[in-house]
Amino acid sequence: MRISLQREAGPERLPVYRQIAEQIRSEIEAERLAAGARLPAIRDLAKSLRVHRDTVALAYEELASAGVVESTVGRGTFVRAARKLNGAAPLAFQPELSPIAERLLELERSRPRFGSAGEAVPMHSLVPDPSLYPADAFRRVLNRVLTEGGAPLFQYGGTQGHPRMLETMAAHLRKAGIEIDADGIILCHGASQGISLALRLFAATGDVIAAEEPTYQNVLSAATGLGLRTAPIPMRDDGLDLAVLERTLARPEVKALYTLPTFHNPIGTTTSLEHRQALLAIAARCGKPVIEDGYEADLRFAGKPVPALAALDRSGLVIHLSSFSKSLFPGVRIGAIAARGRAVDALLALKAASDLSDAMPLQAALAEFLAAGEYDRHLARLRRVLLARRDAVLEALAEHLPSGARWTTPEGGYQIWVELPEGIDTRDLLADAVGAGVLFAPGSQFNHDGRASRCLRLSFAMADAAMLRRGVAALGRVLEARLGAAARPAAVHI
């Protein structure tokens, strides 16, 4: 087996572990490595390629996640037999996929896989900590709703959502300053479905959606899946670059702006009131709508709230998305779109075309959960925990990160953005970090073109304060090994 690595930095270069994985995959698909063949030991292949053994381990992990190889402790890693259906021979027909499907596959394969990361501190994911879920309280509410609602709850409901949850959601948004009633709310399966519906509302195949760079990676996938292109708007310390925004929105092929002004993902910052007002003025001048993603808006644990764009908008420019996936638990899969005017009817038509009804029992239970004050009690506890976790990460960053690094100080949400010294590609750093016992999200996955980045996102969603300190210390050791003893800790905040 021959593997050739591109080691020179460049925008087109894949991370080293992915180069290894893709070349092994090619050997298997070409049947130069047969089913049952044993791959080289991790240590041996790392030595022959002159890479760290954790880089090879990450490559093998990616292949295992794809079902191409399987590892057995004490025996090694082996090529798996082609997958069969009901004992039949391997499929002779492989369908030709659409360009969109191929591109989505490429995007998914470019993302790190953490399936066998063992005891590493999970600072890569924004999935909430299950130990903080108010599961018992929600179960009591759900049981009560099912008992009182009976069989009708299990029928198809309206496309817009459960009537009581629509009223409750409108009241919840009004508390945040967004003037809306139940007629302007459409419930959806989390913010992800809301993003897809909002993109389809404004853009067709070949059109362009403007979005910050870096940005939420799933909006890039959603745009790709709809045959859309994206136009990056650079993020500055105080928010997106307004000059670039105006030039971009003035282009006729650009149909809308997607933005995360509150607890930005991945950066964690919150755009100021003045910056928001300027953004809305630009959108109004250019006649382009704004899709505001407020998925973490309920998670403020410090500082003074800033009005949502939808609260400042008086002309109907803004479509506002919200979700309970991060603030409550993701399994409920309930989000909401707030809109005005003809956009509401159009969104309902788009939703009905692919999704006849929602899970009425869960929506009814969530409405009761909010009305009973259970959600507010949960948020009060969650905010205290998140503040303590954020502070633990900030203290550890100041202690362990090298000179030249800087990071954000979020006032809510789950994420901190770290900018490392020049010359570091965090895609390659990840393999060393996994070996040292910490996971993070490399900045490249939030760039529109996936290019290399010296930045990374650290999450304090899943791990407790002690684990987070341990994870940052591990990251510091990895960076010290990369940069040499000359690196010294320095607290610099963005």
Predicted features and spans:
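AMP-binding (ANL) adenylation modules
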Residues: 446-450
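N-terminal basic, amphipathic alpha-helical segments
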Residues: 1-144, 348, 352-359, 367-370, ...
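Short beta-strand "wing" residues that participate in macromolecule-binding interfaces
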Residues: 70-71, 180, 440-441
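Conserved core of the PLP fold type I
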Residues: 142-287, 298-315, 386, 466, ...
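Conserved core segment of the aminotransferase class I/II
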Residues: 314-384
